[in-house]
A protein has these predicted regions:
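Non-catalytic interaction-recognition regions
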Residues: 1-215
Length: 215
């Protein structure tokens, strides 16, 4: 490998990638070239975005579709254990709900939306309730997840950690007011949302996946 820092890289083997219909095969026409595969996922992402946001212009749709489709492909591969056969279902991989890259991206975009125009100030963690602390505990686990992923050469540990953080954050947000909370509690929860956003962004970055501000 002739590129900068190649000596610090470690090859991580991946087993077969299969479609839901079965193993890819040139005889059956199920053998897919990556460039064609990427175009197909991109096209599907564009159609899904158009269903949700009919007011977006084509340039913005394409920009978001590119980020989402690449996240869907990368995350679906990286969340798997080493040497495990990967079943790639484009509809499942592109969902904004479930164990997908777009789901984690959407949690990051939601954090950005909450924080837009808001200012975080000094806060008191004593005001937190159970769901607030669930998020705090998840954030605290990030350094260990990254360290273990590096030691064991398992990016899946980071991917699955991000899924758990996104789920924990979404549960917290569904049960608690943030922007409409009392001032002191609002400041505390805004700081919490800021921390979640930063960890999601850092984690996605380690996996080579963009963290969009909007979805």
């Amino acid at each position: 490998m002739n590129f900068k820092n190649s000596k610090n890289c470690f090859y991580i083997p991946v087993s077969e990638v299969r479609l839901p219909t079965g193993k890819m095969s040139s005889r059956t026409g199920e053998n897919i070239v990556y460039s064609d595969f990427k175009k197909e996922i991109m096209g599907y992402a564009i159609s899904e975005i158009k269903k949700r946001y009919d007011s977006l212009n084509n340039k913005e749709i394409e920009k978001r579709a590119r980020m989402i489709s690449i996240a869907a492909i990368k995350f679906n591969m990286l969340k798997q254990d080493l040497n495990k056969v990967i079943i790639f279902d484009k509809k499942e991989a592109l969902r904004f709900e479930g164990d997908t890259g777009p789901y984690v991206q959407y949690a990051h975009a939601r954090c950005c939306s909450i924080l837009k125009g808001a200012k975080t100030e000094k806060f008191n963690m004593d005001l937190f309730n159970g769901t607030d602390y669930s998020v705090v505990k998840m954030i605290e686990q990030f350094p260990k997840a990254v360290e273990k992923a590096g030691e064991e050469h398992k990016p899946s540990l980071i991917a699955n950690y991000l899924l758990e953080l996104a789920k924990t954050f979404n549960e917290f947000y569904a049960k608690n007011q943030v922007l409409k909370a009392e001032d002191k509690l609002r400041n505390a929860r805004l700081a919490l949302v800021f921390s979640v956003r930063q960890v999601l962004r850092n984690g996605l970055g380690l996996l080579g996946i963009d963290a969009p501000n909007e979805m």
